[in-house]
Structures are given as C-alpha cells and as structure tokens.
Amino acid sequence: MIWRRRAGAELSSLMALWEWIVLSLHCWVLAVAAVSDQHATSPFDWLLSDKGPFHRSQEYTDFVDRSRQGFSTRYKIYREFGRWKVNNLAVERRNFLGSPLPLAPEFFRNIRLLGRRPTLQQITENLIKKYGTHFLLSATLGGEESLTIFVDKRKLSKRSEGSETSTNSSSVTLETLHQLAASYFIDRDSTLRRLHHIQIASTAIKVTETRTGPLGCSNYDNLDSVSSVLVQSPENKIQLQGLQVLLPDYLQERFVQAALSYIACNSEGEFICKDNDCWCHCGPKFPECNCPSMDIQAMEENLLRITETWKAYNSDFEDSDEFKFFMKRLPMNYFLNTSTIMHLWTMDSNFQRRYEQLENSMKQLFLKAHRIVHKLFSLSKRCHKQPLISLPRQRTSTYWLTRIQSFLYCNENGLLGSFSEETHSCTCPNDQVVCTAFLPCTVGDASACLTCAPDNRTRCGTCNTGYMLSQGLCKPEVAESTDHYIGFETDLQDLEMKYLLQKTDRRIEVHAIFISNDMRLNSWFDPSWRKRMLLTLKSNKYKSSLVHMILGLSLQICLTKNSTLEPVLAVYVNPFGGSHSESWFMPVSESSFPDWERTKLDLPLQCYNWTLTLGNKWKTFFETVHIYLRSRIKANGPNSNESIYYEPLEFIDPSRNLGYMKINNIQVFGYSMHFDPEAIRDLILQLDYPYTQGSQDSALLQLLEIRDRVNKLSPPGQRRLDLFSCLLRHRLKLSTSEVVRIQSALQAFNAKLPNTVDYDTTKLCS
C-alpha cells in the first residue's frame, strides 16, 4: 500500500494502485463493528476468538505462546520513534469537493459483472477475495524497538536456590534480569549476548527482540524527507472503512452479509443473527463450520496443564518444610482426631501461612480453569461432539486433616492408604492391609481414655471419672449394692400389698406412739375447735437400725346421733424427724393423689372408718405423722341435691349444741427397712480419707445411688423434696455444714459422669 504525505500526494497515482488500498482478511473486524448497533457484542465472542488484528498481532501471539509454555511474568523495555499521521487523499477530496472516486477500471468491471442480484458466493469470489472487506482511511507511521523477557519464576527460584550451594557467579536472579534489561539500549550487543547465554543455559527465560513499524525504525532520520512509504504492518494504528460504502446501494446489504459469512464462517456457511445470538448456517460440505476445533483443542490442553499444575501445587505443599515440621510436632502417644489436629493446626502460625499460600494459588488456578471452561462451553455449544471436561476437586481443610491422619496411621511398609475416622480403619492400595499401623488409644471425655498405657499405646492406661479400666478399655462404673446401708423394698408383691391394705391387715401395721394434748382416744370431745394429734416412731431412741415406709392411714371416727358435723382431716408427714416445720403436706384428692375412703360401721353410733391408701405408687418415708382435725356443719342448699358447709363458729346460734365426736383408733400401715447409720458414716469418711482413688469414686457412686433412691420417694410436686439431706441431719446427726459439703461433692462428681442429668430439689430440713 503506497502513501504520500498530505502536501505532495497525487490523486491519480493513488487510484492507479487501488488494489493496495483494499486491505486483506485480517482487517475484517471493523466491518462487524459497523453493524454492532443492531446486534449484541457478546454473541460474537466465539466467532472473533482467533481473528482480527489484535489476535493476529505478533506481540499477542508471543504472549499467548509463552503463557502456554508456563512463563508467568513478562518484562519489557522499549522506545518509540516519532509518529506521523497520513490520510487517504482520494477519500478526503471526495468528502470535501463532492467529486466521485476515480476507481480502477477492473474494480468497476467486477461490479458490473455481478449484476443486480448476485449470490453471496459471487460477491465473495469477484470482490472480497480480490479486494478484501475494508479500505484504509488513515494510518499512523512510526514504530518502536523493544526487548521482551518472559520469566518462569518457579524455575528461576529453584535455579537460584541450587546455585547458592555451587557458585554465586552463575546465579540468575530477577535483579540480574532487571540490570540487563536496563542496559539494552546502552550496549545492545553485549546485553543480547548475555541474555542468549542465560536462555541457552536455562529454560527459565525466553528473550524476544522486536523492531516494529513501517519505517524500519532507525532507517530514516526525518519523515519530511520520505517521498512515500508502504503501510502494511498490522501493528500500526489504522482507521478503516467498510468497502460497501463504495458500492451501489443495491449491493451494499448483500456485500455486508457476504463479508460476514466469508470472515466469520470462512465461506463454509451463511452468517445468521437472531434473538441476540449469531452463528453460521453450515453448508452440506462443512457440517462443523460452527465448531472452532483448534481453539477447543488449545483450551483442552490448557485444562490438562492446569491439572498438572494443581498436582504440582499439592505436591509442593506436602514437600514443604512447614508441612514436614508440623507432622513431626504431632503427638504420637494417643489418637488424634480431626478436631485435635485442627486445634494444633491453628497453633502453628508458619503452617497456617503456608496453607493460606496454597489456598490463594489454588483460587487463582481454579478461577482460570472456570474461565476456560466457560469459554469452552461457549465455543462448543453448536458442535456435534461436546468436549470432555475433567477438573480436580478443590481440597478443603477437611481433606488435609484426613490426609494428615492417613500419614500418621496408614503409612506402613512404604504404602500410603486413606484413613476413615468414622470406621477407624485404613483403605490401603490394591485392597491390602499392610499399610495400616497400630492405632493408639483415644483420649478424651466420658468413655475415652484419660491416658494411654505407656507399654501399649493401643490400650487405655487410666480412665475418666465414673469409668473403670477393664481389659484396656474404659467402662462405666456401676455402684455396688446399697442394700447393706439402707433398704427400700419389701418382699410383698403389689397385689399382695393392695389386698392387705384393703383388709387393713395388722401384719402391715407400723406400731407408732399416739401423742395429743387436745384429746384422748376413745373419749368424746367438743369438735368446735381444731384438734391436733400425731403418731411418731421415735426411731433414734428405739429403732435406730430401721427406717419406715408409709403405705396408708386409717382412723375410726364416731359422732353423736343426729349430729350435722363433718370431720375435716389435714395430714403432714415428717420423713425422718418429729417437728411440724420439717413436714410436708399430703395433697389429698389433688391431681391424681388418693382421697379418703369413708366406710360406715355397723354400730349404734354414727361411726365411720376413714382410710387413705397410698400403696406402692405414693409410698414415702415417715417418722412422724401430724393429723389436724377440724369440723364443719353440713346443711341443705337451695336445691335439694346440694350441700352447704359452715364453720361451727359461723353458725347462726352459737349456743346450740352441735354434738360430740370421738376417735376410737388410728393406724399407720407400712413396713420397716434395714438402716445402718455407722456404715453410711464410714462411706462418707472415704470422701475425705480415700484409701485409693478408686475407693473414693466407689463411695461417691454409692452415695449418689442412695441419694437418688431416697429423693425418688418424695411426695408429688413440680420439684422433688430433698429427703436425703433430712436423712443426713436427723438419722446420722450430721451438722448443716457437713450436709452442704457432702451435697456439693456429690453434685460435682455427678457432673463428670456420662449421660447423667442432675435435678433441682426443694429444701425441707434446715
């Protein structure tokens, strides 16, 4: 393409050489840009992947080739020459004077031969293949001279490390390359000689020297003295215009369509755009015209290289000093689960930094892989055969924790297996078992070992609280029988007990002492005021080796004839003492608690048996039963089926005689159980003076068993009563501080036991 400067250009000489004005195929991209207003740019990406001046430029091609070869860094030093802009004077004169373009006769003849309705193939053969798709409007002359050094930093660093042990003179560092690049324009020959020597001796760098521009750079001292130059280098800044503007109106649209089909489809199909998507409608001879096989193959090769790099990164991490040092510091005297390894991991700052470095490298690698995969899918979406894409999975910290376990426990006889914490076993290569090492014992809480045995790491040496060592394993401790301390059960079955209670059999009667200052048995008394009575056993004085269980209560109450009085009973039970303040109230007829059963006796007087049956369901400890008797007056209500009760003092006529009442007898039904206070005191002494650690734990377990069984017999309520403290205070005569100390020791020991739930109790005894 021949050009003159604007001052001395001749139009005739430019038009005579019109073939030089129409550019070749690599300038087609601006023709596509001319119709970009009606089509989106993104659908063209797959068509423009390997065409156009940018992708065909030498600098871009060199960069892509070096990147595929593994060179990660580029250093470039360059200098530019003066820039001059030249214009197409023929087009400029047409725009200014409005005169027609003096086109070459051959060009006119080819247009006439096309006719009014040419096919796309005719336009391609007669115009596009001869004259191209664009002509040049303007260009910038000049050029640059540059030196480019591509560097593989990994190979360079390894070479530098290896050279440190040999000679310092042969080492190549980034600083050396910087100095050589800076001296290129000062002493070009010696610099290139040194760089080429390094390139031959090492594969860590690639050196490229370029001198671009239509002037041949330093061949011209002054552009004013140049008569004409040839503009044909794709590196220059050029302004193009589509050839269709030179054609008649009836040919312009068909020319654009033919040009797009020629450039985008290589004349193998017709270029079509629809619904923001463009593709080639392939001809019968080229069914794969939409499938850029070379690009797809290059991307598949890139993915393979990424997989190899991924393996290299992981291998470098395992071979790093930080990884090896971390493995050496891991304790070997007990089994390490993933949680323990993770805790040790967080304590090693050097290992953490090395893993973060691996993570960052992997993120960059996978981002690159995802971009390639996305582009690969876009390129192959119209291929008949889809590419096979296989990428390795990202290795999370969980993978590395399991990997570390595999190095510890599945790395015998030169074979590395895979460890599973769930099954506590190894999976060895080729289904062998020779890679499995002896697993040390598991140290932890509950049934895990406290320490491993020093002579055999696979077995427990000591156990946690509440567990005992048995054949190298820790098993839950079971409290020994507490029957020789205190009894809880009777030999009678439930049905037998129920029958004896119904019959008020004297064989289950507990003989208690009746005490009352308000009345006497078998004596009539005025029931207008509340009467208090109690039945007590005085076990500390008479029956110190027994505790007692109440199953029922029976009273025989008689009234004078025609009396309208109704007895009302309130019962309080003290489990191990005698005072009323440490007694609990029986919730008679509340919720599911039993009610009094009244049975009339065949006697001349109004006598009734009042019986309260607790049975095995509601049985509880008792030492003293407090009974409070008061009376109420029964009267008919407004309706005949209703009864109204009055307090005696509320009656209209206080002077009226309401009758008398007497209690013939009171019986307590239940049974007595064995109780050894001295043995329990000895058990408590072991908390302060244990013979061995095992004896103290055994004593605590037995006391816990006694405490829970005693408190389980507390009366119904939202919270259990603390009957065990009452037992310690009244039957063992312990001080309040001693009781608090024992309860605290039991609570602390119970918290260490497995699968135990402590419960809150209500204080009963002070």
From Swiss-Prot:
Its main location: secreted. Expressed in the brain. Weakly expressed in embryonic stem (ES) cells. Expressed in ES-derived neural stem cells (NSCs) and neuronal cells. Keywords: Cell cycle, Glycoprotein, Growth arrest, Mitochondrion, Secreted, Signal. GO terms for cellular component: dendrite; extracellular region; mitochondrion; neuronal cell body. Induction: Up-regulated upon differentiation into neuronal cells in the presence of retinoic acid and BDNF. Down-regulated upon differentiation into astroglial cells. Down-regulated in gonadotrope cells by bone morphogenetic protein and retinoic acid. It holds the Pfam family EGF_BRNP1-3. Residues 1-33 form the signal peptide. Glycans are attached at residues 168, 337, 456, 562, 609, 641. The keyword Transferase does not apply. Residues 74-264 form the MACPF domain. It is found in: Secreted; Mitochondrion. One of its GO terms (biological process) is cellular response to retinoic acid. Disulfide bonds: none annotated. Belongs to the BRINP family. Inhibits neuronal cell proliferation by negative regulation of the cell cycle transition. Promotes pituitary gonadotrope cell proliferation, migration and invasion, when overexpressed. May play a role in cell pituitary tumor development. This is BMP/retinoic acid-inducible neural-specific protein 3.
